[in-house]
């Protein structure tokens, strides 16, 4: 209902939108076995179901304007990591959703793009680094994959993708190579996890993180109220 209201307000103030970006995202960390089912579901509700609701609210406008819908995905869409099961599942889901939507609306002149983003300097990522298990997740990645990018730089890249109606945009650009080799990632991640997780368990460092960042906590509070 809130998205429908936002779509209506956008039309009244600015006219029919020709570009829509589905960007809302929250994250929790920790083992799946001990995760709170409601918190796990909340991540999927915001990241995946919320993206679908965004598309549903604005799709009539995009059909009228032959517009462009950009779905924000993640490196997690290409390769899942341990301790982030809800986030990885939701980001894999938004990738599949965007591919499906693209196939449905292409003949109507609507373009659908997917943005694959790595670590961005936001409150969510800064908060994640406070938790040993998530900090280890990032620091065990190859050096180029550990780097964070400023939100302004990423936004500029996304604007260029919007202007060109890209079907895919990668930030950083080398994520294209991950796309090509994504089938090789699960065994590599599993091998690394078998080596590192026992040590983290022994250090009692595998507890749940709760919602990450101010945005995640605000989303959690909103979900609790509803």
Regions found by a protein language model. Give the residues of each.
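Substrate-binding pocket helix/loop in short-chain dehydrogenase/reductase
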Residues: 31-32, 36-41
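Active-site helix of classical SDR
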Residues: 55, 90
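Active-site loop immediately N-terminal to the catalytic Tyr-X3-Lys motif
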Residues: 32-33, 81-85
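SDR active-site lid
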Residues: 103, 107-173
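Residue(s) in the substrate-gating loop at a strand-loop-helix junction
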Residues: 74
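Conserved NAD(P)H cofactor-binding loop of Rossmann-fold oxidoreductase domains
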Residues: 23-28
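Conserved amphipathic alpha-helix within the SDR
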Residues: 1-15
């Amino acid at each position: 209902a809130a998205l429908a209201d936002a779509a209506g307000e956008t039309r009244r103030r600015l006219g029919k939108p020709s570009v829509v970006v589905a960007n809302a995202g929250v994250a929790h960390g920790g083992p799946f076995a001990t995760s709170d089912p409601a918190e796990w579901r909340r991540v999927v509700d915001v990241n995946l179901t919320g993206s679908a609701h965004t598309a549903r609210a604005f799709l009539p406008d995009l059909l009228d304007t032959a517009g462009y819908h950009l779905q924000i995905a993640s490196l997690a869409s290409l390769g899942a990591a341990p301790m982030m099961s809800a986030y990885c599942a939701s980001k894999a889901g938004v990738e599949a959703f965007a591919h499906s939507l693209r196939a449905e609306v292409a003949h109507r002149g609507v373009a659908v793009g997917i943005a694959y983003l790595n670590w961005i300097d936001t409150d969510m990522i800064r908060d994640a680094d406070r938790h040993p298990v998530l900090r280890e997740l990032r620091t065990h990645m190859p050096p180029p994959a550990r780097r964070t990018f400023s939100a302004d730089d990423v936004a500029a890249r996304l604007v260029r993708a919007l202007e060109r109606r890209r079907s895919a945009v990668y930030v950083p650009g080398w994520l294209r190579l991950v796309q090509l080799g994504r089938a090789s990632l699960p065994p590599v991640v599993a091998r690394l996890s078998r080596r590192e997780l026992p040590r983290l368990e022994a250090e009692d460092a595998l507890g749940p993180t709760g919602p990450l960042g101010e945005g995640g906590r605000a989303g959690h509070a909103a979900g609790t109220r509803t």
